[in-house]
Amino acid sequence: MIPICPVVSFTYVPSRLGEDAKMATGNYFGFTHSGAAAAAAAAQYSQQPASGVAYSHPTTVASYTVHQAPVAAHTVTAAYAPAAATVAVARPAPVAVAAAATAAAYGGYPTAHTATDYGYTQRQQEAPPPPPPATTQNYQDSYSYVRSTAPAVAYDSKQYYQQPTATAAAVAAAAQPQPSVAETYYQTAPKAGYSQGATQYTQAQQTRQVTAIKPATPSPATTTFSIYPVSSTVQPVAAAATVVPSYTQSATYSTTAVTYSGTSYSGYEAAVYSAASSYYQQQQQQQKQAAAAAAAAAATAAWTGTTFTKKAPFQNKQLKPKQPPKPPQIHYCDVCKISCAGPQTYKEHLEGQKHKKKEAALKASQNTSSSNSSTRGTQNQLRCELCDVSCTGADAYAAHIRGAKHQKVVKLHTKLGKPIPSTEPNVVSQATSSTAVSASKPTASPSSIAANNCTVNTSSVATSSMKGLTTTGNSSLNSTSNTKVSAVPTNMAAKKTSTPKINFVGGNKLQSTGNKAEDIKGTECVKSTPVTSAVQIPEVKQDTVSEPVTPASLAALQSDVQPVGHDYVEEVRNDEGKVIRFHCKLCECSFNDPNAKEMHLKGRRHRLQYKKKVNPDLQVEVKPSIRARKIQEEKMRKQMQKEEYWRRREEEERWRMEMRRYEEDMYWRRMEEEQHHWDDRRRMPDGGYPHGPPGPLGLLGVRPGMPPQPQGPAPLRRPDSSDDRYVMTKHATIYPTEEELQAVQKIVSITERALKLVSDSLSEHEKNKNKEGDDKKEGGKDRALKGVLRVGVLAKGLLLRGDRNVNLVLLCSEKPSKTLLSRIAENLPKQLAVISPEKYDIKCAVSEAAIILNSCVEPKMQVTITLTSPIIREENMREGDVTSGMVKDPPDVLDRQKCLDALAALRHAKWFQARANGLQSCVIIIRILRDLCQRVPTWSDFPSWAMELLVEKAISSASSPQSPGDALRRVFECISSGIILKGSPGLLDPCEKDPFDTLATMTDQQREDITSSAQFALRLLAFRQIHKVLGMDPLPQMSQRFNIHNNRKRRRDSDGVDGFEAEGKKDKKDYDNF
């Protein structure tokens, strides 16, 4: 049989019926019927007039819409009409009509075979049934074929299968008006079928009687089912009549009609009387269209030329009872609050992205609410318990209650019989918390379905493969079933019954026609699968504390925002003067909902427009948009990147300083270890070198005029104890203190960050200027300030103790001018105040093309920021007339030479970091010579860049790494050889493309004085007077280790005083020069 589903309209086209029959013969729809059941079904389908379906002609497609009654709008309980060969059960009038209409709806299915017609011989027709009572209602059906009084008897050997979804006709029949509740409806007994190629349909309107037939022996394929009363939330049923089956044990057919007795169904009266007027009009229209339909069907029959033959039913054959179809399978998802048509759809829904997102959001909200009860947005909100949403105000809550989404959920819950919470708003004062219960993943396997079925029939708890499913009804849902389970013998053969996955019980009492079979099935389930019947269901416990809404609380929620701008919302009327929509002139928007007018006036968009165009003093809450939020996040990300960059830079500087100290510590440790070794070697009689100690090497590694000594095994590096100790001790005294290094690092980093902000400010100003004016040019130019770089001793790491001046170079995209310099000097104090609370003194030195920044706290540091641009050097390197390029220069351009010097300082710093920083002892010797240039006036004229080049060349040209003492000696040897004198090769600048001597600024006298001083310092080094060169006191001598090999005749010079007095007063005078 066909279950009732809330489908409202469908259309059948005869040209497609063959394909449906093919699917039916292939067992496409999954129903199992025996052959006798199929024949009984065919007999029933052929004789009952279809009052709910209009079959169309092959050339014309006709359809209609069945309107359901408001009372039974959500009824999903199936009602079945048994076939002529099954047990006749008394039923209410609307249910019987539904069954008759359902059976008639499938009476016109052709068979799948088109070549063979299975005909049977004529048999004597049985005695006609008695005439119907006077109250029998005759239906005038609007069929599109000609009726005939001679039913055909042609049977198909194939079985008929029905699809449980196409049941709109049954719902339509249930809504037909009925003159009386206790009226008797009859069902005809003769069987009829249709031949394969027939297109002419004949069917006589016969009276119907319900005949009680002796039930046949139950077959294993027989399906017993339960008929549940229908419930409605609009008007509940007062009392449900008990369905009492009537059985007669006789060998012949009985025509005794079985009728209903008892109270009337008040739940159906609204549907019956509301559809009376529409049904009467339909009957009048059907009578008018009958003549035209009959003529069209007659023409079709004449064209086909086929007739139907009637075959009398078998008098002596006992028919097997026919299986009714399965009840409807309803799949409901409590997370998404939707229902699915079948298990495949429900499975796909569970695997879909929408369900997973909602489930993840639900879990996240539960975890968040359980961990933090004061989450954002949970205070002062109106909550809808049915939809599980929160509204920020009373207007939004009212709009949600009227909305389509809420109504859809209400309709679905009403149809499923689920409890519907009250629509009264509740103020949420705490977030929801959940108690997660472990649950198995929903599946649709047959084993789980069987287990679920057992649970439904035996335990009065509707558990299934779906989550959160509950049933409504009386507490005595299936109370008698449990007692019957234990009373049934265990050795009885269990019958295979088909039960729905989920039966929603909406009435007061559960009634069934197959209690015995169901009890046996329940016993089998309890015996075989007692464990699988228990399905874990996840429970979500709502810990939300909802307070009853009082008028005061609603007023408090609504008083936060007052509507503004009533005068700017005008009513738009049509020609009849009816208001069709509202138009807001401020927001330039229209809406047709009168309830939305007040909400629009309170909305943030309208208030922002009102503030912008009418009242700037209106207070509007700050709620950044997605774009503004993204911009803010981008700014924060950039700020974090800046902070990370400066932090890494400071760490690199700190690491560099630590590595320098580590190198010094390693040197001292290695020197002390080797000191003991060489002291012992020096006291050995034959120790040392086999050919005597090697003499000092020349500049190129070989003494001039002497053959190279034979090379033996590579000796260990011989440290000069006194020279290295003195050099490193001097270096430790001239190295900056920790306070000075931190002060330099602080002021330099603050200055660099402030200049970056100044660059951003100037760039924004230029953009605004271009937007206000004509932005056809200047649109694609770079920012005015491109970057700031460290130069000089700061970049090279040559700071000495007491140095307070460092240099920075600010690169510009254009040639720097006095105007740009003044603008930077004006903006720099503002940006410095943003970065650091300390005070700084800023001076603008136009002659130096620089800005001088002085700190006001100890130790006072000075930063010189020189402006330059690479364009100046590019123009200077061009061939031809330079004045042609200078015509474009601004009138207040800064000093060209100062800018070129700043560019040269950039190249020098880059070269030094690449060549000299990694050279052993190079940085230490340059610091020693810088201190020498500051102490001795003769050396003050030596250019620092030339000295750096000379030291790097002298140390890098050595055959092996040099210790600090050897490196200093080697540098003095180079200068003493006359490399800086006039006529010598000189020192070419590696950072210039054209040959350029770095000593060009020195006079001849200065060159000779420095060369002479270097020669005298070399003599002092030879006589162990390096402390005089370095300007420091002699270090205490290390303790002597006396041994038997010490056969020195002269006394060791260990008194710590100068041993150079015996040389005469000449050496004393030369020492005074240092």
Swiss-Prot record:
Kindly list the positions at which Phosphoserine occurs in this protein: 1054
Note the position of the cross-link Glycyl lysine isopeptide (Lys-Gly) (interchain with G-Cter in SUMO2).
Answer: 509, 541, 623
Q: What keywords would UniProt list here?
A: Acetylation, Chromosome, Cytoplasm, Developmental protein, DNA-binding, Isopeptide bond, Nucleus, Phosphoprotein, Repeat, RNA-binding, Ubl conjugation
According to the UniProt entry, which residue ranges have a biased composition of type Low complexity? Answer: 365-377, 427-447
Q: Region annotation Disordered: residue ranges? A: 120-139, 349-377, 421-447, 702-723, 761-781, 1040-1074
Q: According to the UniProt entry, which residue ranges have a biased composition of type Basic and acidic residues?
A: 762-781, 1062-1074
GO MF terms listed in the record are: DNA binding; double-stranded RNA binding; RNA binding; single-stranded RNA binding; zinc ion binding
The organs and tissues expressing this protein are described as: Expressed in lung, liver, lymphocytes, heart, pancreas, placenta, brain and kidney.
N6-acetyllysine-modified residues are where? 509, 516
Main localisation: nucleus
Q: Does the keyword GTP-binding apply?
A: no
- Where found, per UniProt? Nucleus; Cytoplasm; Cytoplasmic granule; Chromosome
| Database matches in SUPFAM superfamilies | beta-beta-alpha zinc fingers
Q: What is the effect of changing residue 319 to P?
A: Found in a patient with spastic paraplegia; uncertain significance
Write out the GO cellular component annotations. Answer: chromosome; cytoplasm; nucleus
Segments forming domain DZF: 703-1073
InterPro entries named among the record's database cross-references: DZF_dom (IPR006561), DZF_dom_C (IPR049402), DZF_dom_N (IPR049401), Matrin/U1-like-C_Znf_C2H2 (IPR003604), NT_sf (IPR043519), Znf_C2H2_sf (IPR036236), Znf_C2H2_type (IPR013087)
Function of the protein:
Involved in postimplantation and gastrulation stages of development. Involved in the nucleocytoplasmic shuttling of STAU2. Binds to DNA and RNA.
Whom does it interact with, and what assembly results? Found in a cytoplasmic RNP complex with STAU2. Interacts with STAU2. Does not interact with STAU1.
* Record protein name field: Zinc finger RNA-binding protein
Its taxonomic path starts at:
Eukaryota, Metazoa, Chordata, Craniata, Vertebrata
Which gene holds the coding sequence for this protein? ZFR
